Amino acid sequence: MTAAESPAPPTRRLGALRLLWPFVKPHWLLAVGWLVFLATSSGATLVLPLAVRHVIDQGFSDSNAAAINEIFLGLFGVALVLAFATAARYFCITLLGERALASLRGQLYAHVVKLDVGFFERSRVGELISRLGTDTEVVQALVGSGISVALRSLVMLLGASAMMVWTSPRLAGLTGLVIPLVMVPILLFGRRVQKLSRASQDRLADAAALANETLNAAPAVKAYAREDIESRRYGVAIMRALDSARQRIGMRAWLTAVVIVLFFGAITLVLWAGARDVLAHTLDAGVLGQFVLYAVFAAGSIAGLSEVWGDVMRAAGAMERIGELFAERAGITSPPQPVTLPRPVRGALHFEHIGFHYPTRPDTAALEDFELDIQPGETVALVGPSGAGKSTVLALLLRFYDPQSGRIMLDGVDLRALALPELRGVIALVPQETAIFAGTAADNIRFGRQDASDAEVLAAAHAAEAHEFISDMQGGYAAELGERGVRLSGGQRQRIAIARAILRDAPLLLLDEATSALDAQSEAAIQQALQRLEQGRTTLVIAHRLATVQRADRIVVMDGGRIVAQGTHESLLAEGGLYAELAHLQFVA
C-alpha cells in the first residue's frame, strides 16, 4: 500500500496541528505582539460604524459642519491607527511563520537523518524530500497567514456580533438564529477538504519520488533511451496530483459559495426587517446604518473563516504526514548507559553465533550461526559468491542492524553496549559505492574527519593517489565536484573514499570492494596505499581482486550466510572447494 492509498487516521483531525506548538512556543513574543496589534486593528475597524451612525443621525447641514469635521478628523486618526496596527500585525505573524518553519524543517531533518538504515530502505527519498519541502510550506502558509486570517476573522466576528447586540438586540437575535445554518456546511465540507488535501499531498510526494529516482539515474535513462517513457510516467503522476488538487479546489469553492449565499441571504432578510422598522419609525436610520456595517463585517468574517478553513484542513493533513515522520523511531540506538571502549582501542573482534535476516526479507537468513575471531591488527578477507553475507558482516559491525541472535564483541565489549558515535568513530569505511557530496574536493575528503587541517587533507589525498587528478581540476582542492560527484570517474570517486578513510585514522578498517572501480595502474598504486593504511589496524576486506585477497593474513570463505572455509590463499587453493572454484573463475580466467 502506498502512502497515497493509506487511510488517514480517524482520530486525527485538527488535533494534528497541536504538533506545531513546540515550534511556535519559542517565538511567543512575536505571537504576543501579533495578538496586541490584532486587537488594536480590530478595535479600530469596529469604531468606524459608530462614526457613520453619527453622520446619518446628525445629517448634512451648515449647523452640523463643525461636528462633521470632528467626526471625519477622528476617522482619519482611526485610519492611521488601523494602518500601523495592520502593518505591525503582518510583520509579527509573517516573521513568526518563517521562524516556526525554519525550526520545523531543522528538527524534522535532524530527526530523519538519525533514523536507522532500515527506515531509508523502506522509504522513498523523493517522498521524504516532499515532506521536508511541500508539506512544511503548507504548514508555514497556515502559521504565516492562515492563522492570522482565521483569528482576525474570528475576532471581527465576535466584535461585530457584540456591537450588533448593543446596537439592536432584536435584529441581532434574528441574525443569531441563522449562525448554525452557516456552521454546518463549514464542518461537513471542511472534513472532506482535509481528506482531499491529504490525498493531493500524497500524490505530489509520489511525483517527487518518481522525479528524484529518474534524475538520479539520468545516465541509465539515456542509455536505454527512456526519456520519453519517463516523461510520460512523470506526466501521469502529475495528472494524478492535479486530479486530487482539482477535487480539493472544487470542494473549497463549493464551501465558500454555500457559506456566502447562506450568510448574506440571512443578513439580507434581517436587514429587510430592520428597514421595515425604520419605515415604522421604531428604529433610527443611523442605528440601522450602524447595524448594516456591523452585519457586513460579521458576514465578511464568516466568509473569511470559510475561505481559510480549507487552508486549516490542508495544513492539518500536511501536519499528519509530518507527524508520521516524527513518530518514526530508530530501531538502532545507543544504550541509556553506554560502556566506554578501553583505550587504546586494539580492534579485537569476536562474532559469536550470529543469526541475522534483513527486516525486508524475514524468511531468508543473511547470516546463520556465523562465528569468527579476528585478532588486533589482523587483515581478514571475506570472499564468496553474491548473497553469501559478506556485506552483511560489515553492516552489523557498523550497527546498521542488530543480529536477531548472538553478539559481536569489540575488545571484549558488546557492540550494543556502546554509544553509536563511539562505535562508528573507531571505524573507517571504504564502501563499494562512494557517496560524493555537492561540495569541494577538500570538503569531501574532510568528510572523514571534520576538524582535519588542510595539510592533513593534502597528505591523505597523496596517500590515496588522489592528489594528481585533484590538482589537475580547475580550482584544485577548491573545485566543486558536483552533485553525487558527476564530474568524477568511478575510480576517482573511490580514491576520494580511500582518502577519507586515511584521514579518519581509525583502528578498525572496513574495505568493501575498495578497488573495484580502479584500472590496473591505479590499483597497483592504491594497493600500496592500502597496505600502508592497514598496518597496525584490524582490517576486514571484501574483494574479488587477487592482489587484495593474497595479501590478507587470513581468507574467510562464505556461502549461504555461513563460513565454509578459512586459511591463506595457498592453503585454500590446495584444499579445492568453493575458494578454488572462485579463484579459477575470477582470478585465473
PLM feature spans:
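Membrane-integrated ABC transporters
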Residues: 1-46, 60-75, 89-93, 97, ...
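Juxtamembrane helix-loop junctions of ABC transporter transmembrane domains
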Residues: 3-13, 36-37, 44-57, 78-125, ...
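Alpha-helical segments in transporter systems
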Residues: 18-21, 29-50, 54, 71, ...
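Transmembrane helices of ABC transporter permease
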Residues: 26, 30-40, 81, 145-199, ...
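An intracellular "coupling" helix at the cytosolic face of ABC transporter transmembrane type-1 domains
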Residues: 26-29, 117-118, 134-143, 147, ...
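Transmembrane helix-loop-helix hairpins at lipid-water interfaces of multipass membrane proteins
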Residues: 31-85, 92, 165-170, 268, ...
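Helix-loop-helix
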Residues: 64, 70, 163-177, 247, ...
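ABC-type nucleotide-binding domain
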Residues: 342-589
